[in-house]
Amino acid sequence: MSKGQSLQDPYLNILRKERIPVSIFLVNGIKLQGQIESFDQFVILLRNTVSQMVYKHAISTVVPSRNVRLPVQDPNAPAEEDS
């Protein structure tokens, strides 16, 4: 896992698993709302009345409808290596 993904993936995964409604603001100011159905390195699938594939490079901010707690990671734990 790359260091750039070490916060993003667990955060999006919690939003997906717990089906937390989110507002996603795009860089052009458009607001999308729904639940994260799936995601990968480049896109997020957002479900509302339909599924939308949103490219991450177009996203400015992801705002959950409630507070989200990430699992506490030991700062002394060895970093995961890319395989």
From Swiss-Prot:
UniProt GO MF annotations: RNA binding
A single BP term in Gene Ontology: regulation of DNA-templated transcription
Coiled coil: none
Listed GO CC annotations: cytosol
Record flagged with keyword RNA-binding: yes
Domain (Sm) ranges: 9-68
Matching SUPFAM superfamilies: Sm-like ribonucleoproteins (SSF50182)
Keywords from the named record: RNA-binding, Stress response
Gene3D superfamilies tied to this protein: 2.30.30.100
Role: RNA chaperone that binds small regulatory RNA (sRNAs) and mRNAs to facilitate mRNA translational regulation in response to envelope stress, environmental stress and changes in metabolite concentrations. Also binds with high specificity to tRNAs.
Oligomeric and partner information: Homohexamer.
Family: Belongs to the Hfq family.
Protein name (record): RNA-binding protein Hfq
The organism's taxonomic lineage, starting at the top: Bacteria, Pseudomonadati, Pseudomonadota, Gammaproteobacteria, Oceanospirillales
Encoding gene (name): hfq
